[in-house]
Amino acid sequence: MRKKVLEHYLQTSTYTYAGAYGDYFRSLPDNVAELGRLVCSQVIHRVTLHEGNTNANAKLQYGDMTKFPWYRMRCEDDILMTAAAMTAELFRLDKRGFVPDRRVDNKIVVTCRYVSVLMSAILKAKNIPCRSRAGFAPYFQPERSMDHWINQYWNAEEKRWVTIDADGFYDENGMNLGQYDIADGKFDHAAKAWLDVRNGSVDGTKFLYADGLGTCSLRAVIRALFYDFHALMNDEISYQFQPCYIDNKFEQLTEQDFKELDELAMLLLSPDENFEKLVHIWETEKKYRIMNSPLVGDYDNLGRW
């Protein structure tokens, strides 16, 4: 792997910057699987909280959900956007920090993007190149692939990217995923999903965006495509961040727009080999970076590219 690429994935964003927690992150376990299990022990996924002590939590592996305070928000994604914010809240709730025996009422409720950001922040602080990735996980529901975020870290000894998913105790629950060294093909990367739907080789309804509205196919994949592109450029945007030119404008996109995204997806299939081309697009294609968010919209952004 080229030094330039690895150096890029040591850099941090607003989201992954450790700040005052750098030394603390470096004190956490160096074994990635052990670290992932520790991080997982600090969080509750909003779906797990909603389902209570059933399904994935039938054995209370994530804790007794009846003990979660009624007055706490049922999902804290909107509040804890950065690794530093999540870490600060964990220390506020339990001054011991990251501990395997954290009580349910002291855990934070965040989803996969946030666990991915936290893992990226910790590994980068340890001087291990790491990147968050967005796509779809086919291992949650039969015949469906759910929008999901994971990580890849550089194993210097083996000279390869290792794909991991620290968002749950999947292996312990018998999923047979190998979640701390996920084999190629077990995760649906956004670029391949986009191209497969575009060329008709895969039924797009397989890919589902978990908004509760049934959003699927290209409408779902276009979101993941930009999540992944931004994450590869060390800008791990959250779910409600989308380029202004596509935000709530899917029906207005032209075939030329789709062809441009086909070209972006082709490059994203091999992000290391196409690193310079992706960086060039990142630095020059304004419409891919001018973002709408919950508070910034068309009023602020239209006409800026």
Language-model features and meaning:
Residues 2-106:
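Secondary-structure boundary elements
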Residues 3-14, 36, 41-45, 55-72, ...:
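His-Asp-centered catalytic microenvironments across diverse enzyme cores
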Residues 29, 33, 110-113, 117, ...:
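Conserved structured core elements
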Residues 97, 117, 140-142:
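Generic structural signal for short, flexible, solvent-exposed coil/loop and linker residues
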Residues 105-133, 151:
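Cysteine-centered nucleophilic/redox motifs
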